[in-house]
């Protein structure tokens, strides 16, 4: 069993493996009280006035306490991050990393701008961890890239992957969990998909070009293509995106 897990881990592409490792280490560290979540959450005031720039990154790595909800999020992170990196971004590691950086920037911008809007500032001020939103962004982009793959929800009904984000969003609402994480992830995912794939076909222009310094970091090598199968899944609530 341990050998199988080790082999599965080693076969992950570099970005997926790095992000999954950072997320697990950060969350486990907080659970063991080695790291404090108070040093990780997104706080614009501390970032600007006290130069705690690491918060712009660490808020994407913490998935709250170690429980079933955490395992669900790790499943979605490992599965869809890996599928994207090995299929849609095969041989384009730098482009995949740029997608994540773009998504993180959009999500952070939404929270910062939302915090300055009257009547919305209170709600946005509670969004201090965006890890779930970034994961949902990957799910959204994957669903747009693979719209015809058939999926099963709890064995109750089947649907095509194009509807996966909406099924997950609806399930969050159905169980009474906050859908903010899902919704923000959908916004970031749609922004990337439109600018990276739709707009270039419409205008023959590419507004999202991966910086050369990122391309220089990775040698684009062919990887084994992951073949997604029909899956049965349950969606964990995203209520931890809000903090009281």
Curated annotation (Swiss-Prot):
Q: Which keywords does the record carry?
A: Endoplasmic reticulum, Membrane, Transmembrane, Transmembrane helix
Localization per Swiss-Prot or TrEMBL: Endoplasmic reticulum membrane
InterPro entries from the UniProt entry: DER1, Rhomboid-like_sf
Q: Which Cys-Cys disulphide bridges does the record give?
A: none
Q: Membrane spanning segments where?
A: 22-42, 97-117, 122-142, 153-173
Please give a single GO biological process term from the UniProt record.
Answer: response to stress
Pfam families in alphabetical order: DER1
Topology with regard to the membrane? Multi-pass membrane protein
Which sequence ranges are listed under topological domain Lumenal?
Answer: 43-96, 143-152
Main localisation, per the record?
endoplasmic reticulum
Topological domain spans for side Cytoplasmic: 1-21, 118-121, 174-244
Provide the Gene Ontology terms for cellular component: endoplasmic reticulum membrane
Q: Which family does it belong to?
A: Belongs to the derlin family.
According to its UniProt entry, what is the function of this protein?
A: May be involved in the degradation process of specific misfolded endoplasmic reticulum (ER) luminal proteins.
The protein's name in its UniProt record: Derlin-2.1
Instruction: Please tell me the species this chain comes from.
Output: Arabidopsis thaliana
Encoding gene per record: DER2.1
